[in-house]
Amino acid sequence: MKSQNSKEQKSEFSYKETLNLLKTDFSMRANSVLREPEIQDFWAKNNIDFELGLNNSGKTFTLHDGPPYANGSLHMGHALNKVLKDIINKYKTLKGFKVHYVPGWDCHGLPIELKVLQNLKSHERKNLNSLSLRKKATDYAHKQINNQMEGFKRWGIWGDWDNPYLTLKKSYESAQIGVFGKMFLNGYIYRGLKPVHWSPSSRTALAEAELEYPDDHYSKSIYVSLKITKVPDKVLLKGCQENPNIKKESFLGNSFITIWTTTPWTIPANEAVAVNPKISYVFVIDEDKRIFLFAKNLFSEISEKFNKIFKILFEVKGSSLENIEYQHPTKNKNCRIVIGGDYITTESGTGIVHTAPGHGIDDFNVGQKYDLPITCVVDEKGNLNEYSGQFKGSNVLKDSNDLIIEYLKGKNLLLLQENYKHRYPYDWRTKKPTIFRATEQWFASVDGFRSSALKAIEDVEWMPATGKKRIYSMVVGRGDWCISRQRSWGVPIPVFYKKNGNEILLNSEIINHIQELFSEYGADIWWDWEVKNLLPENYLKESDLWEKGTDTMDVWFDSGSSWAAVCEQRSELKYPADLYLEGSDQHRGWFQSSLLTSVAVNNKPPYKRVLTHGFALDENGRKMSKSLGNVVDPNIIINGGNNKKSEPAYGADVLRLWVSSVDYSVDVPIGSNILKQLSDVYRKVRNTARYLLGNIHDYDPNIDSFEIDQLPLLDQWMLGRLVEVSSQISHAYESYEFSRFFQILQSFCVVDLSNFYLDIAKDRLYVSAKSQFRRRSCQFVMSKVVENLAVLISPVLCHMAEDIWQNIPYLTKEKSVFQRGWPIFSQSWKNESLNQHITNLRNLRVEINKAIEGCRNKQIIGAALETEVNYLPKDKFVKDSLNWLRKFGNEDVDLFRDWLIVSNFQVVSYLAENSLIIDSNELGEIQILKARGLKCDRCWHYQKEIVSGIQNTKLCKRCAKIINL
């Protein structure tokens, strides 16, 4: 069915020139690759960026940057982290806080050292000493920092880029020595022989935070029989009493302790076996009259594994087994059963634990209790040493296990061998297995201040709240912190050792002196200068007696000292910091190392609040990896890839919008489909801003500003809605719920503005006389909306916000959107009763639009103006709201007909004939009819009274009056 005016003769004349059409230089396309750098240059030239925060008069806000490692290209994890921080800093700046964001870099450690070595030829490596290695590492780190810094700047991140903190700077190294010194003088630093996580691939000790635990590691597990040589009388007596047929000699000549281990290479280091005093154990006998000892709860499992029929002889508690002796499996000596702890369970194995104090923490602790030797059978390369006997020279990660298994098999001590899948610690850098190895190391004694650290955790706000439980459990259960490393690229432990002796020289005088030297000359002097030049004057006479230590500090001690090297040192910052914000893996990393050092030195946490985020995954929730080909590069998101169709240049703001769109408290996906969706949202916001800017091109706020009660009801509602949205977005920023900002922004731009207010405003803006009140009042509202919209989005869409601000067509007091400050509104703009009426009318409008859309889908009509609407109300509240609008509304703006963009609307008591469509719903009966009258060629409304226009055109009286016809 065709529309009623389809047969009418149309004129070629157009009234377009008489309309107030959109005019703005704010382009529909962002052209981000060119425009964003221009905006960044504008900020830099006008000191808008981080200096703006310094000039604020409010309280200081310190978000302390967790330093990324100065190695490698930037990835989506960097983007998530740095943009989150920047959103917060920009918001706080707009709120008037003194904000000074100091970006940092973690510069020491093995990855950089390995990169330097990889870049050298073999002959260069041979001639390389520690000092020259450090020089090359410094140069490498600076290059990496410069590359990463340029990337961060391109993302729109504000910070003190001219003065970042680097852990390789003299001032930082000096402050770190100060932290170490205070911990030592407080009694929290000691040197001792103790098993530590050791990486044969890196040839250094590792802290817990430097480990990762893949779930799919396979170990060669073995069940071994250890021949019993001596049994306490009370155990023998019990056995013989309960088994009269077995003589005492049988227990000593043909009985065995059964152990299980996943590290066969540690068998030569065995010094004891341990039992749990609370567990019940059984002596059993097999068909060959051999007697075995293992946990009672494992009887069925072991019988099945060994494929043997065992008979239980008698049962004893673990506490009764102490001092049973056995023949060492590889050495000519006897060892004994000792009492262990709750780490011995019956979940797997035999309930009896092979104990090598030099190669396990629990083993070491039991060894200390029983004064067992701490035998270390492995060198720094992972090769078995002379203490392993005939196995010397084999490698624990290669052939040692096989050699020892074959040996045990030959001695008829091997009961069973099988592969065992479990979580196992790997070196996070080399991705190779680690081992436990007893070496002389420096430790921070966490026991000395654990209770203070736990109290400090309680004093901090953790977001999400689960972070508190996570770090609390880690600190409760952690052992002492091994802080020494056997590498050159790091901050040295400032200790001197007596030549040919065990005495060390480390005291307050030494520490203060080294700290002063490092402050002036840097840590390189430790390798460059002789001992006499490093010692204080009082020790010069005995300088020949001492030699420098060669260990450096754990890089987690480096970054964990940043509160002292940065927050305490810089007057623009606060200690404790207001906020630490990093990935959730930092509960075992930077959050924890910073907490431990700060509590040990100052008995307080280094932060007031800790916020964590998840990891960036691909669209399918998989970890990104080159092998999977699913790596998303933030640089390609911004600048585009080689194929601009498949990898378009979205710009930094779309990257930032992604950060604001996700629930970052968990792992977050990113990929091409998500980017397309975000680009659509970005475009909608931009087009909304463009429409607002384009329709205020001739508006002057100095001439046409209005009080709220002078405005039509629709405009009053719009300003009230602006206040609501601003409040909601403020709350989202304050609570760090940026995905709420994303949702509110979308709804405001699409639902409130594009689909409602701006849709209705078209007639007011385009058709009205330029200076007519109905147009100027709308422009007044739009100016308020666009100014405040620019501010509200600026923490996230900083480039778009500035672009909007630069295209506001009238003079503003502020050169930049960031100088505007956070929106403050008149209380008079809030009107709850008005809100309820408008909500009722919007609900009715939605239902009427559905009915009109039904006509359009059937091709009965084209535009909504070709219709008129009859409404038979059922809903009392909607009817009341229509009466309210009729009574209090402005007749030029607040006619519900104009809100519907139809040619006529009326409330009726019965429905007319000749309906195009009738829709019945809970609000009432909605009848859509063809509009009566003729179409005005200028405004397209249908009117009964039409006058002749130019060149056979038709005009309504309103339009004729506007163009003076």
UniProtKB/Swiss-Prot annotation:
Chain positions recorded as L-isoleucyl-5'-AMP binding sites: 582
PROSITE patterns assigned: AA_TRNA_LIGASE_I
Keywords from the named record: Aminoacyl-tRNA synthetase, ATP-binding, Cytoplasm, Ligase, Metal-binding, Nucleotide-binding, Protein biosynthesis, Zinc
Sample GO molecular function, one term: aminoacyl-tRNA deacylase activity
EC number: 6.1.1.5
Cofactor comment: Binds 1 zinc ion per subunit.
The UniProt record lists the keyword Protein biosynthesis: yes
Binding residues for ATP: 626
Disulphide bond pairs: none
PANTHER family per the UniProt record, alphabetical: ISOLEUCINE--TRNA LIGASE, MITOCHONDRIAL, SOLEUCYL-TRNA SYNTHETASE
Subunit text: Monomer.
Protein name: Isoleucine--tRNA ligase
